[in-house]
């Protein structure tokens, strides 16, 4: 797992925003929601913004997380989506 200090800095459960930056592809949002649904089922309404040149999309989604491990798992899974460049 990742070596983070989320457990020292946060109280769980809490809403946590993830920003996924990836290649501009219309399926990116659906892929992000699918990964989140596997780990935290719910009704999500992500926001999507295109980069100034339109080459990339950033998808922001707020997820209720229950632990440090939950956050780290989501970071790892979201980073594994095809076309994803960064997860913030």
UniProtKB/Swiss-Prot annotation:
Q: Which SUPFAM superfamilies match?
A: YbeD/HP0495-like
Entry-linked InterPro entries: UPF0250_YbeD-like, YbeD-like_sf
What Gene Ontology terms describe where this protein resides (cellular component)?
cytosol
Q: Which residues form the signal peptide?
A: none
Q: What Pfam families does the record point to?
A: DUF493
Q: Which NCBIfam families does the entry link to?
A: PRK04998.1
The family line of this record is: Belongs to the UPF0250 family.
Listed name of the protein: UPF0250 protein Shewana3_0990
